[in-house]
UniProtKB/Swiss-Prot annotation:
Organism of origin: Yersinia pseudotuberculosis serotype O:3 (strain YPIII)
Entry keyword annotation includes NAD: yes
Highest taxon, organism lineage: Bacteria
SUPFAM superfamilies: 6-phosphogluconate dehydrogenase C-terminal domain-like, NAD(P)-binding Rossmann-fold domains
GO biological process, one term: mannitol catabolic process
Family: Belongs to the mannitol dehydrogenase family.
Protein name: Mannitol-1-phosphate 5-dehydrogenase
InterPro entries in UniProt: 6-PGluconate_DH-like_C_sf, 6PGD_dom2, Mannitol_1_phos_5_DH, Mannitol_DH, Mannitol_DH_C, Mannitol_DH_CS, Mannitol_DH_N, NAD(P)-bd_dom_sf
A GO CC annotation given for this chain: cytosol
EC number(s) reported in the record: 1.1.1.17
Protein keywords: NAD, Oxidoreductase
Gene3D superfamilies, alphabetized: N-(1-d-carboxylethyl)-l-norvaline Dehydrogenase, domain 2, NAD(P)-binding Rossmann-like Domain
A GO term, aspect molecular function: mannitol-1-phosphate 5-dehydrogenase activity
Amino acid sequence: MKALHFGAGNIGRGFIGKLLADAGAQLTFADVNQPLLDALNKRKRYQVNVVGEQARVEEVKNVSAVNSGSPEVVALIAEADIVTTAVGPQILARIAATVAQGLITRHQQGNTRPLNIIACENMVRGTSQLKQHVFAALSEDEQIWVEQHVGFVDSAVDRIVPPSEAGSTDILAVTVETFSEWIVDGTQFKGQPPEIVGMELTDNLMAFVERKLFTLNTGHAITAYLGQLAGHQTIRDAILDPAVRQTVKGAMEESGAVLIKRYAFDPQKHAAYINKILSRFENPYLHDDVERVGRQPLRKLSAGDRLIKPLLGTLEYQLPHDSLVTGIAAAMSYRSEQDPQAQELVTLLAQLGPKAALAQISGLPADSEVVEQAVSVYNAMQQKLAH
């Protein structure tokens, strides 16, 4: 199995790339970070530190790397059996032209073996969005050929992979938690789905996508935002603060009530899933910084993301949402000198005021009760910070 993975960052190396390599794939990473590519090509291997109760070091072998802007990538797509990505939602559109060129070359070479493309991003149906960008760069004839021979497979991914420790001397080493979940839409494959241990097939992907988004992502973000407000440095410190924990757990229970209503989840099993996630946030071996987890607040406050989407579900089913609203107010309070979106958020709040700013970012009606509530909590948070 020939595999090409876009994104040689921590998630690429520590999660998706690792599962592909473990499955015996001939794996090539595509990235723009030249020192990283040089190190991968020189060593052909790297270490993954799996941390938890039983820490272990695993080695990923027989890997290579190419620059994602190079002609080699096009040639690899023309030959690959599987193409995966972990580049971040914003970058997906940027790699689409390269993917399209690879598919055109594949067509020209007469390669009719099935190819499956799986975007492994923190977004809802990311591969379907990638497909739209790719198809925009294809002629009608090429689109027809691609529809026949290429599967665009949506997925849900879950593994906490913090950045490398400061002072780490090995550019390739990566630290990951023990837990990992990669769920793919089994209905979207062309040909037989590849056998990859750790990749689960489902015919009801949206239930898993929203379960993860509404629980892990919602909880992680709110832990970060409330943690920063309370002066905590790491996710672990924040979630061990009883006040933060109460709101985070409350928000996950509120979003969970939406999932139970929408997908008929078992309430007891979902409660256990929430507790499992809280224990993952407490992992003493993961040093995950609240400022890192909170970054890109404009994206995280957008209509389809981890804060507003579950809130919209509570409004749809007339369910409680006080903790989610507190989380939204905390996201509005996020500040970071390192994050351009945090700077933009501050500008919007100053120019428009909190009410109009939240409405513009989230798509919620400015005069809605829920926006009034979020602004009221936000103002109280700002007053508290001022004293």
